[in-house]
From Swiss-Prot:
Keyword Signal set for record: yes
Positions contributing to Zn(2+) binding: 51, 160, 168
Disulfide bridge map: 58-64
Organism: Drosophila melanogaster (Fruit fly)
Protein name (database record): Peptidoglycan-recognition protein SC1b
Tissue spec: Constitutively expressed at high level in gut, in addition to the induced expression in fat body.
Gene name, Swiss-Prot/TrEMBL: PGRP-SC1b
Cofactor(s) the record lists: Zn(2+)
Amino acid sequence: MVSKVALLLAVLVCSQYMAQGVYVVSKAEWGGRGAKWTVGLGNYLSYAIIHHTAGSYCETRAQCNAVLQSVQNYHMDSLGWPDIGYNFLIGGDGNVYEGRGWNNMGAHAAEWNPYSIGISFLGNYNWDTLEPNMISAAQQLLNDAVNRGQLSSGYILYGHRQVSATECPGTHIWNEIRGWSHWSG
């Protein structure tokens, strides 16, 4: 009986973090800290903003967990933010990782935060290689965001450099996203 209950709970927890087509590794699964506080984020948002963390790249789940914890510690302890800044992050392993998630406003693009979700790739894409599994994960996540009503069907995709004075999301990501259907120059 206990094993059936444990299995049921595991299925429920996993389904909570399953987007329409892409599995999202929960903050608890990657060892993230709880937010100090949150601010709600609406539905049918107009923008998705793509970033890179400009730090360490990761290729395995264990490496990505460590990098995520480091990014979160920097955001919370050094910058004084209540949580990691992005809604979702994508590792070199092709996994999508929960940051602030679907319903909490991020801290990734100043005045754009209330109107957007922030998706960041772990690494520095001025020199790190953007792999096909990472591109696929990001595109699936964006499609899921539309299907679940988080992004409007006519959302606009920006690279961080379009809304702030920065090199983010790095040259390799920048060159990639300019070919995506929702990107706007």
